[in-house]
Amino acid sequence: MSPSASPAPDAFLEDRHLALAERARSFGEYRLRATAHDEAHPEERTRQIVGQLGAGGLLGAAIAPPHGSMDLRSLVVVREQLAYFSSLADTAFAMQGLGSYAVSSAGTDAQKNRWL
């Protein structure tokens, strides 16, 4: 049995998680698959991926409410789909969550409005 990028229905996932997983899968299919093995310049490619994740609305899954939509299941389904297509994309997504956590949990309102 080979792995599949399609999210499977799960008793632990709500419809919103399945929809988010499908968005992440579609992102991987159309933005990552063709270039997944072209990671000769990881710094440049990482910036490109993060920009695409932001434009695609997926970075919100790495940011806590009210500025984002993060909950554990959302975080997991996005990372699962990104990792299927590109470990660099998964790492870039995870790093955005690590970087934004300090601002979302302890930043001033001005910092949150600027960075999140």
Stretches found by the model and what they are:
Residues 32-116:
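Glycine-rich flavin
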Residues 1-19:
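Intrinsic disorder at enzyme termini
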Residues 15-30:
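A non-catalytic, amphipathic alpha-helix used as a structural packing/dimerization or gating element
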